[in-house]
Amino acid sequence: LDHNTQPGGSVSYSGQTGGLNYVLSAVAEPRYDHNVSKETSILADFALNDEVREERIREQTSYDFSLNLDYELSLKSSVRFNALYSENDNPTDVLRYTTDLRATPRATAIEREEIPGDRNNWEIGGDYEYLSEGGDRFKVLFISNRNNSASTRERYDVFADGSESKDLFLDLGSVTTERIVRGSYTMGLFEGQDIEFGAERAQTTLDSSLALGLPSSAGTPSADFGGLVPQAVSNANSTVEEIRIEPFIIHNWIINSRMTLESTLLYELSEISQSGDVNRTRDFDFVNPKVDFRYNLTPQLQLRGSAEKVVRQLRFSDFVASNDPQDNDSITLYGNENLRQEWFWKYDFYADYRLPNDIGVVNMNLFYHQHKDRIARIDVSPSEDNLQSANGNIGDGDVVG
């Protein structure tokens, strides 16, 4: 839009020393964005309400540095290690013009926003694999990562004489960490059959904070809130942690040259705790089976049927107060500490037909899903004058298609 040009590039170096293979890389990717938008709203009787014109400029360049190591310990064992560090600061400036279409003459209010943003993350991971003489395989892996995000949104009313008055201070910060370790052992059973069993343990933590300041005659302005009056926000400062353990067993069976069957049984045990403005601990457990059958009816026609229980992982950001920068009508979004995992039974039938001379493939999918504890937006308004919504469990439902 403004013909802005920014440089970017990447460089990598790879090599081998004995049994060690390595790759180092660095990437600088410009993500500058200049966006101009117009939004017109109407009332319930279809009368024009207002028009909002907004110019948003984001100055951002992503810097990524990675390392990959692969070492062959012997003909039967190997180890790998990966590391990543990334910086994605995204300072943003906003200029907004709001025209009241109900007023005569029409009046336009001007707002300016400064939103410095700091974002960075890192991740390390690795795995070890051992193959026995008989073809059995043992594998263990680990992953550890951390994501840091912080932003301070300050909004100003701009008057006709060029003077300004701050009317919003919103400081947001979050740190998400995750640690996963998984081990498995795969062995043959009978001809055409093998079994894999193991377990996974994961720890996920979110530290979240939100500070809101508004101009108000009721209260004392604070420098920590941009010179505005601190406002009470429900669930603004919280730490959410989940400890999850998943033992599993997977059986693969090649019945014949045309049919295969995969069966999985997973047991999920988790504890979710929240501390800070809200203190609560809950335990959950699920048994998740899965069956997947494949049949090559002809070389051109493949059929597949599956049935499984799926448990969706919760988004920790739904537990705590947050902000939608694209919604100017709602400064903060409520969190919901009572969320439960959404889960569903998933039944699918697939058919793939390969057209003659390999000119294409025709696919068909029939499905039936039984959802439990579906998550969607619910009303959590404390009063008719303070309308609020949050993600919550709305009940059960079926999906057919």
Each predicted region: which residue ranges?
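Membrane-embedded beta-strand positions of outer-membrane beta-barrel proteins
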Residues: 24-26, 81-83, 140-142, 197-199, ...
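Outer-membrane beta-barrel translocator domains and adjoining extracellular loop/strand segments
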Residues: 35-44, 92-101, 105-107, 150-159, ...
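Extracellular loop and loop/strand-boundary signature of outer-membrane beta-barrel proteins
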Residues: 48-55, 107-114, 123, 164-171, ...
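Transmembrane beta-barrel wall of Gram-negative outer-membrane proteins
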Residues: 3-36, 48-94, 116-132
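Outer membrane beta-barrel strand-and-loop segments of large Gram-negative receptors
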Residues: 178-182, 336, 340, 346, ...
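Face-selective signature of the C-terminal outer-membrane beta-barrel domain
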Residues: 66, 70-88, 112-276, 296, ...
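Transmembrane beta-strands of outer-membrane beta-barrel pores
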Residues: 2-3, 17, 28-32, 85-89, ...
